[in-house]
Regions:
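Juxtamembrane segments of multi-pass membrane proteins
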Residues: 52, 58-64, 417-543, 547-551, ...
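C-terminal transmembrane helical bundles of large multi-pass transporters
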Residues: 501, 609-616, 625-734, 738-745, ...
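N-terminal Sec/SRP start-transfer signal
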Residues: 1-34, 289, 306, 315, ...
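Interfacial "coupling" helices/loops that link adjacent transmembrane helices in transporter permeases
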Residues: 15, 264, 280-320, 672-714
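Membrane transport/envelope proteins' first extracytoplasmic loop
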Residues: 1-276, 288, 307, 464, ...
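Short cytosolic juxtamembrane segments of multi-pass membrane proteins
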Residues: 2, 387-404, 775-787
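Small-residue-rich transmembrane alpha-helices
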Residues: 276, 280-288, 295-298, 319-351, ...
């Protein structure tokens, strides 16, 4: 082994605790990078494999009813590869020993070969026997929520008739990886399920013999999805087509794609912070090492070692530290990635997980870490090797000592001598002090981000369902029906109040921009549905014109007072120019609103409603559910409280895991920065502190001088961290914004106190470790003359 290599390993061992602290910060950065990208790659690979093996469709369309021979016309559309027609129906399910209303979607399976597209993966049990009308397959999430196994029995109200069904198999489908009820906001596995049964009995129940009301397609390579959708809409329009959609807007795929986008954002943000802090730590450690070894470096150069040789020596030392951090980070990241992926599997239902930590991710993590570390150490090393040996052998010029700015403000008499020493030392090294503050501040910021999502989601739900939508129950009809149905529901025992509504699917267009959504027709002065602005103040519903959420208005590039083209996707399909009269604020979905009477006039129809929002007496809910099951026109109902409860039960584990990970990673930064700063300060000032001990200062007083500096920097860093954290949270909220939801930048006071508390505890722990070293200073060795 070369002499310089022996020197390098000896120095690494001598400063092993500092090396460990830096390696932990690097490991945190690498871990967050590997965690995010490996989770993303694993889920993407799993999704792609599932889609391919089980023929997930690329275009979807629903309609009223079309004869089966229309399938040939659809297959003839240029760019269409495979076509499958189906019968699908929303039904009410009766679950034994479960009082709440349960909705389901029944989908037909063609006999005897099963589905061509959107095939089902059999988790347990068997497939349906051809010709059987009483057998069904059930989605795994729904089965797990109710403890169903093959052989269990449930009842479905199919077109007004009760049908007993035996569950023969538990399955998963690429079409329902993320399973959410129509009109629902959150997944509720207990109250919404997807079932599959033979086509013949399902078609007979809905007068669909030789007909279909649902069609899915795959496309030929290179085909234009937009062109196929346009031609498909033309084919199915006479049969009550509701407008075809591509895979990108299919609800399950859409939610999963948004989750992938979030992981990409995290992979971009957090590693930069961690590796930036690691770069700073390496800078101060190498700077301290180079200063301490001025004479050694000069001696080496005097004995013939080149600048390049000395430079390579310090580069190797930095590289060894990085390698330690990268290796630990890869292991940490892989473990966190697997845990994260398995956590996502609880929400997104895949049949298996193809977990992978790819070579590009590993190489990328190593290269980025090494680059950041070398950049951090570069200045100090170049400064060391550039000095002539004769100059480097001289001791460094003593630092300039003068009163601190605070002392010159007239408060000198109020400060003790040790306190003045602390302030002077901080001011004498402004760059190092500032970088320490920034490093600690970033740990506060990361902690705030970890807690922010919980704060924001709670706020989002509170605003959406506490201020905007205040119903207890949303009852949805099979199809638009007479206003008289509203009074029928009001007369149910336990119903205290109700507001009718109308839903109409539309394409909204402004110039070259368009967006597919639904206009919700509501009553002026509605008690249960309120339009609100960004200040949570009510916005009056205009008698005429359209009201849009601000997000949708931005997507369309339209402002209040301008005209929007409204293309209705059902009924007579009118196309109208409607003025935008107001903008409202919502966190969930993208909605358009109109006065219900004005919407019915736009449709050219009578006084129709699509459903009713109800305020109910909780004591009568079970009776209300039973009554609703007896009304044929009712497609189902949504209990808002149950949906919210189910959402938090599902998301609670995810939010908790995320908070724990962020706490661990942020704690590593705080400890790494504080400990290294304290150790370097101790190394630089050991002679000074030892001199004070010899002069009669007690251990506590000497510790105060050193640790007081760290305490001041930490206390200054915390409010700076609050500013960084709020900015980072605002960026995350903006980056995660989509048509599915907008996360508000809401940070609870408890988040500030928690973030500050964790950083303070981390600082105290680091301080106590350094305090032990101060207490055991070797006064004789430290005071020996270096020359």
């Amino acid at each position: 082994m070369k002499m310089l290599d022996k020197k390098m390993f000896r120095e690494l061992w001598q400063m092993k605790s500092q090396v460990l602290a830096i390696a932990i910060v690097i490991a945190s950065g690498v871990g967050s990078f590997v965690m995010s990208l490996s989770t993303l790659e694993s889920l993407q690979t799993t999704r792609a494999t599932f889609y391919q093996e089980y023929n997930f469709a690329e275009v979807f369309a629903t309609l009223k009813r079309a004869p089966e021979n229309v399938k040939e016309r659809i297959a003839g559309i240029p760019g269409v590869e495979l076509v499958e027609t189906r019968v699908a129906a929303n039904v009410v399910l009766d679950i034994p020993d479960f009082a709440d209303a349960v909705r389901g979607l029944l989908i037909s399976i063609d006999e005897p070969y099963g589905s061509l597209l959107n095939k089902t993966y059999l988790r347990s049990g068997r497939m349906i026997v051809p010709g059987r009308a009483d057998e069904a397959l059930v989605s795994e999430a729904f089965a797990e929520a109710h403890g169903f196994e093959p052989g269990a029995e449930i009842a479905a109200i199919i077109n007004g008739r009760r049908q007993e069904l035996t569950i023969v198999g538990v399955v998963l489908s690429p079409e329902y990886i993320y399973m959410i009820a129509p009109g629902g906001v959150f997944p509720d596995f207990e109250r919404y399920g997807v079932l599959w049964m033979n086509r013949e009995p399902l078609a007979s129940a809905y007068d669909m013999d030789g007909a279909f009301n649902d069609v899915t397609l795959t496309l030929s390579p290179g085909a234009s999805e937009e062109a196929v959708i346009e031609l498909l809409d033309q084919v199915i329009e006479p049969y009550g087509g509701f407008g075809a959609i591509g895979r990108d807007t299919q609800i399950s795929h859409r939610f999963l794609s948004e989750e992938f986008r979030s992981l990409r954002i995290m992979a971009r943000i957090f590693p930069i912070i961690f590796l930036g802090v690691a770069s700073f730590l390496l800078n101060i450690v190498i700077t301290r090492l180079v200063r301490a070894q001025r004479e050694q470096v000069a001696t080496l150069k005097a004995f013939g070692y080149s600048n390049l040789g000395v430079l390579w020596h310090f580069t190797k030392l930095t590289t060894v530290i990085v390698i330690l951090g990268v290796v630990a980070g890869l292991g940490l990241g892989a473990q966190l990635a697997r845990s994260m992926a398995e956590m996502y599997m609880e929400i997104y239902k895949f049949p298996y997980l193809e977990f992978t930590v790819s070579l590009p991710v590993v190489v990328g993590a190593a290269v980025i870490s090494l680059t950041a570390a070398l950049l951090g150490a570069a200045y100090s090393v170049f400064q060391a090797v550039s000095q002539p040996p004769a100059e480097a052998m001289r001791p460094e010029a003593p630092a300039i000592y003068r009163e601190a700015t605070v002392e010159r403000l007239g408060v000198k008499r109020l400060l003790t001598q040790p306190t003045r020493m602390i302030l002077r030392h901080i001011e004498r090294q402004p760059v190092k002090s500032m970088m320490t503050i920034i490093g600690i501040a970033f740990s506060v910021a990361i902690l705030m981000v970890g807690m922010f999502f919980s704060d924001a989601i709670y706020r989002m739900v509170q605003v959406q369902f506490g201020f905007a939508q205040r119903e207890d129950l949303a009852v949805i009809f099979v199809e638009p029906t007479s206003y008289r149905a509203y009074y029928e529901l009001l007369n149910l025992e336990g119903v205290e109040y109700g507001d009718p509504f109308r839903f109409v699917p539309v394409d909204l267009k402004k110039d070259h921009r368009s967006f597919r959504t639904a206009i919700q027709g509501i009553e002026p002065g509605s008690e249960l549905v309120r339009l609100i602005d960004t200040s949570l103040q009510p916005v009056p519903l205009p008698r005429e014109g359209l009201v849009l959420t601000r997000y949708l208005a931005d997507v369309l590039g339209v402002q209040a007072g301008e005209m929007i083209t409204v293309k209705v996707l059902r009924g007579r399909r009118p196309v109208r120019e409607v003025p935008l009269t107001a903008l409202v604020s919502e966190y969930i979905g993208v909605s358009a609103y109109m006065d219900r009477s004005a919407l019915n006039r736009l449709m050219g129809e009578g006084d129709l409603i699509s459903g009713v929002y109800l305020a109910t007496d909780e004591a009568h809910l079970e009776d209300i559910y039973l009554k609703l099951e007896e009304i044929p026109r009712v497609a189902g109902s949504v209990n808002v409280d149950n949906s919210i409860e189910s959402f938090f039960a599902t998301m609670g584990n995810q939010l908790l895991t995320w908070s724990i990970i962020m706490t661990m990673l942020a704690g590593s930064i705080a400890i790494g920065v504080v400990y290294n700063s304290a150790r370097i300060a101790l190394a630089e000032r050991s002679r000074e502190l030892a001199s004070l001990r010899v002069l009669g200062f007690r251990r506590g007083e000497v510790s105060y001088i050193l640790l007081g500096e760290i305490a001041v920097l930490t206390l200054v860093a915390i409010p700076v961290g609050f500013i960084f954290g709020r900015g980072l949270c605002a960026y995350m909220a903006s980056a995660f914004q989509s048509d599915l939801m907008r996360i508000p930048t809401i940070i609870d006071p408890s988040t500030y106190s928690y973030s500050a508390g964790v950083v303070l505890v981390s600082s105290v722990i680091s301080g106590l470790i350094v305090r032990r070293r101060i207490d055991h200073l070797d006064l004789v060795a430290v005071l020996k003359t270096r020359e």
